[in-house]
Each structure stands twice: as C-alpha cells, then as structure tokens.
C-alpha cells in the first residue's frame, strides 16, 4: 500500500507539472499550490485508479505499530484511525457511485490544485481564473456528456469538500509515514517536482 501511495502521489505531482497553465506560474506559486492540494490530488488519484482506500485488516495490521507510537504523541485518539479510514472509504464509495469519468477527474484535480485562497501566492487572480476555467470545463463536459443528469455538475463540486474530511497530516501519517519517516512532506513534494 505504501509503494502504491508513493506512485499515486508522484503521478499527481507529475500531472500538475505537465499542465501548461500550472507551468506558467511562478515556481513559488507552483510549490505553494502543491503543498496546499497534495492530499486531495492523492485521494483523487487513489479513487480514479481504484486504490482500495479502506484496506481495513491489512492497513490496520501494518499501521498498528506506527499508530501506537502516534497515539503516544497524542496525534491520533483511540479509534481515530478506524474512523478516518471509514470516512475515506465513504468518500471513495461516493465518487464511485457517481461514476466520475477521466475528464471529470482531470477537471476536479485542476479545481483542487488552483486554490487562489492559499496564503503567500504571488498571483492569486491568475490562479482564480485558472480554477474558474476548470469549473467551466467541468460544467460543459457534464452538460454535454451527461445531458440527462442536470444536477451532475453541482454534485461533483459538492463532492470536493469530502476530500478534506481527513486532514493532510493524517493522510500523510496513514499512507506515507512509513516510507518518508520524519522527512517533511513539503521536501518530498519539492523533490518529486524537481525530478
């Protein structure tokens, strides 16, 4: 699961890096946007590529030792891991029930990536425009490809906050801590981006 998680995160970073609109931003803005959205991009990739988010027994077994040490530091409360995995699985099921197609996943990733309210951005107006373009593309795609589902665009937008139901620190702890150890996720992302 850890190797798959690393691949999915790498794919998300590579996807963003290959977007011409993303590449046109300053390096600093690119890094800030990746730092702000990596967990959601990872989850969207995991959902799109059918990674079993709730690999219950396997995940709980393999994370048991890690979570016990995390519990001692107060990060996870007893039962919190199971609850977070349940939330992630519910999110996966919700996306699967809507049967999000590849074009919709791409638009949703762009909407998540181009978050103009992220602190420290040099050009938040341009980033907001890019997010608006992604929303327009998603709306047009939904309207043309799913004409009988008039509420589809709204439903897809309303599903995006589900990706933040479990915060990025917990996503990092659940899926990446064993492989990255104490290395800050920001450094991991920067290294992935540069390679």
Report residues per predicted region.
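Nuclear receptor C-terminal ligand-binding domain
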Residues: 1-195
